Amino acid sequence: DGTPVRLRFDAPAGITTLELYVTSQKTGFRDEYINMVDADSCRMLINAAYEPTFEHLGDEFGKTILGFFTDEPGFMNEKGATLEDASTSSFIGRGDMALPWSDELARRLHEELSASWLAELRGLWTRDPAGARVRHTYMDIATQLYRACFDEQIGDWCRKRGVMHIGHVIEDKSCHTRLGQGAGHYFRAVAGQDMAGIDVVINQLAPSVDHGRYSYFHGAWNMEFFTYALAKLGSSAARLDPKKQGRCMAEVFGAFGWHEGLREMKWIADHMLVRGINWFTPHAFSMAPFPDWDCPPHFYAHGNNPQWPHFGQLMSYMNRTATLLSGGYAMRPVAILYHADAEWAGNAMPIERVAAELTRAQIDFDFVPAEAFEDEDRYEVSIADGLLTVNDCRYQAFVMPGASFIGAATAEAMRRMADAGVMVLAVDEVPGTFYDTDGAVELGGLVATPLADVARALASAGLQTVVPDTPQPWLRALRYKRVGETY
C-alpha cells in the first residue's frame, strides 16, 4: 500500500543476496482482469455475465442460444514486448515479470518442491539451467489451474445448462506456450471447451509467404507458425479430446483489409479445411455505416462490396466441405511432441519448425502434449505393434523437436515406442536432462536427426499422404475416413 517497511537482519559473512517477494492484485496491465489461477475470482465472471444471461434467457438455452464464445482470454499478468523473432517476451524466467499467483498455486508449489520451495523461487526469474525444475513446476501448476479455474469451470457451467462453451486464446507470438497475454499451454487452455478454437486475422496467412517475418501495422508476424502450426494446434486438440468430437472452430477473414476478396477467402478456407478445421466464424461483417474503418473487409458493406452477391457460393462450398470433414477420422500417421513443457525448462525448438518440413512433404501429423503420457484420467495411451495410440488417434511415428530437457514420463514412453516398433526421431538435439526429476536421461541410444532429414526419414517409412513424382512443397493433402468411405 506504499507504506515504507524497514527490514532488519544479520547478514552472514561474505556476499549476501536478499530476495524479497511481494504479492499484489495490480501489475499495471489489465488490473480489472480476473485471476486465472483462482477459482473464486473466475467464478466472479460467471456470476456477473453468465448467470444473468441464463436468468433472462434460460428458456432459449439449447434452442436459440447454443453456447457461449470466449474470445482471447489469457493470464494478462503483463502486456509483454515483441522480440526479434516475433515472439512475446512473456516467457517464464524473465527477470522483471510479475507472475500469476494465488494461495492454491503457492500451496501446490510447496507440495511439489517440499520445504525448500521458497529458496528455489529465484529460478522463476532466471533462465539458468539450475532453475529448470522450478520453472517447469510453476508453469505446470499455473496452466493446470488455468484449465480448472477458468476454462473447465465455464465449460461445466455451460454443459449443465445444455449449451456449449467455445472460443479461442491468443495463439500468435508464441503466446500459446507463455504467460502475459497468453494462456501458457494451448491444450490445457481449451480443455473445457466443446470445440477447439483458433483465429487468423490481419494477414497472418498470405499465399506463398510461409516463413520469415511479415510486417503489419503493429509489428511483424512469424509466418512459419501461422502457415504450418496454428490450424494444426486446433485440429489436434479437437481429435485428442473426446468431448470435442473432432470439432475445431476458426475465426477467419477478419481485418485482412479490402484487398481480401473472395479468391483469397477461398484460399484461406482451403488452408483451414485441409488441416482439419471444420467449423467457421466468418469474421468480416459490420452493421456500421460504410465505410467502417474497423477490421475490413466487410462482406455486405451496405451494398458497397461488389463481391457480396457471390459470397453465398463461398459459404455454401465451406459448409458442404466442412460437413464432409466432420464425424469421421483423419489419417495422421505422425505425432509431434508439443514443445511447451520443454520451453518452460530451457531451450526448445518450436513445433512449427518440424511441422513445416513435414507439411512440405505431404506427411500429416498431430501435435501431442507431454501430459498425454502423464495424465491417465484424460488420456488413454497404448503402445504396441508399431503404433502409438492416444485417445483412439493412431500414430506410426513420434517426433520430438530439439530440446535440452524432457519429462520422465515422456522419456519412458519414447523407450516403449522404440521397443514396440514405433519410429522415434529427436530433431537436432537429444535432451540430456529431466525437467521433473533427477537422474540421467536414457533414450535407448537415440541419436539426433537433423531437421533437414526428418521428412525424408518419415517418407522412407511410407508415411506420406500422397507420393508425388517430384517434390511439391506447396501441395497439401488430407486422407479422411467417414461413413465407410475414404477420401
What are these regions (language model features)?
Residues L57-G67, E72-Y487:
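Carbohydrate-binding surfaces of carbohydrate-active enzymes
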Residues D1-D71:
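Mature N-terminal, pre-catalytic/accessory segment of carbohydrate-active enzymes
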